[in-house]
Amino acid sequence: MSQKYLFIDRDGTLISEPPSDFQVDRFDKLAFEPGVIPQLLKLQKAGYKLVMITNQDGLGTQSFPQADFDGPHNLMMQIFTSQGVQFDEVLICPHLPADECDCRKPKVKLVERYLAEQAMDRANSYVIGDRATDIQLAENMGINGLRYDRETLNWPMIGEQLTRRDRYAHVVRNTKETQIDVQVWLDREGGSKINTGVGFFDHMLDQIATHGGFRMEINVKGDLYIDDHHTVEDTGLALGEALKIALGDKRGICRFGFVLPMDECLARCALDISGRPHLEYKAEFTYQRVGDLSTEMIEHFFRSLSYTMGVTLHLKTKGKNDHHRVESLFKAFGRTLRQAIRVEGDTLPSSKGVL
């Protein structure tokens, strides 16, 4: 799996930049930007690796002696380390603009190895800095740029933005039998739109979204002139795939869910977002259809969904009325899914380190 990186400017971003001479060359000039340490810890927990990259004009010359730089810089690094903040690398350009070197930001000389290794997740890596040159560096690297500012984009805002993404997925599945378009928003509620051509199935899918606490849009064109088999099966496959993609790296999710709702029907549902697809299903129905949905396809739907989502799912229901029995399964699954996808922290809920 490719690695997420944050390439972070030093002066004006990690620590304050003195407006008088733009040099942190005395201990009394060293001051950390508000909230930087707790947010860097949060970002590390979210899977980011940190790289410091900084232009230090004339470092090592008479105007900026190396010893004057080293004292405050080493103290800064000691403080970061003592609090658990670890930088994989510190990259420094010591040249003046007039030197026309190859390593001064926004040129990419200092970060060439990250670009060459192909191990960097470019879509989810960022340059963070307070100057236009930092944003230009991001563009030159082909990654995202965040312009740090104490008022408009400070460290708490950056931490929130990079660890609380909108968990969204869009899946299109086209076969000779069906054309399916599924969108899911795990962190938004309400406004679901579902049209599979099977009215009762639409109602059941809406139960998943409503009780799962998320929004989805599903549009299906299937070979219903034959029967509902391909429509229900392929919808399960596409929805399971969309849920898996929207969950992303699964950091911070509860992972497990269990509900036992009791009404006219007793339904049990247990779920583990384990990466291991498996279904245990027990339900009996009096009739072959409820509305326009074949009751035998209900198990097939959940089996298809659990396969592409990569979950272990146990479902069981008892009751007298077929409509209520079917509905209890979908409601129970929705409530269980709501528990399992809820984000409560930043760690991956697995001792293996992968889900």
Swiss-Prot record:
Cofactor notes: Binds 2 Mg(2+) ions. Can also use Co(2+) and Mn(2+)ions.
From the UniProt record, give the pathway where this protein acts. Answer: Amino-acid biosynthesis; L-histidine biosynthesis; L-histidine from 5-phospho-alpha-D-ribose 1-diphosphate: step 6/9; Amino-acid biosynthesis; L-histidine biosynthesis; L-histidine from 5-phospho-alpha-D-ribose 1-diphosphate: step 8/9
Q: Please tell me where Mg(2+) binds in this chain.
A: 9, 11, 130
One GO cellular-component annotation of the UniProt record comes to: cytoplasm
The known regulators of its activity are described as: Inhibited by Ca(2+).
One biological process term from GO is: L-histidine biosynthetic process
Q: Where is this region: Imidazoleglycerol-phosphate dehydratase?
A: 167-355
Q: Its Enzyme Commission number? A: 3.1.3.15, 4.2.1.19
Gene Ontology MF annotations: histidinol-phosphatase activity; imidazoleglycerol-phosphate dehydratase activity; metal ion binding
Catalysed reactions, as listed in the record = D-erythro-1-(imidazol-4-yl)glycerol 3-phosphate = 3-(imidazol-4-yl)-2-oxopropyl phosphate + H2O; L-histidinol phosphate + H2O = L-histidinol + phosphate
Q: Where is this region: Histidinol-phosphatase?
A: 1-166
Q: Tell me what happens on changing residue 17 to A.
A: Severe decrease in histidinol-phosphate phosphatase activity in presence of low magnesium concentration. At higher magnesium concentration (5mM), no effect on activity
Superkingdom is: Bacteria
Q: Where is the active site?
A: 9, 11
Q: Which family does it belong to?
A: In the N-terminal section; belongs to the histidinol-phosphatase family.
Q: Which PANTHER family match?
A: IMIDAZOLEGLYCEROL-PHOSPHATE DEHYDRATASE, IMIDAZOLEGLYCEROL-PHOSPHATE DEHYDRATASE HIS7
Instruction: Report the protein name in the record.
Output: Histidine biosynthesis bifunctional protein HisB
Its source organism is: Escherichia coli O157:H7
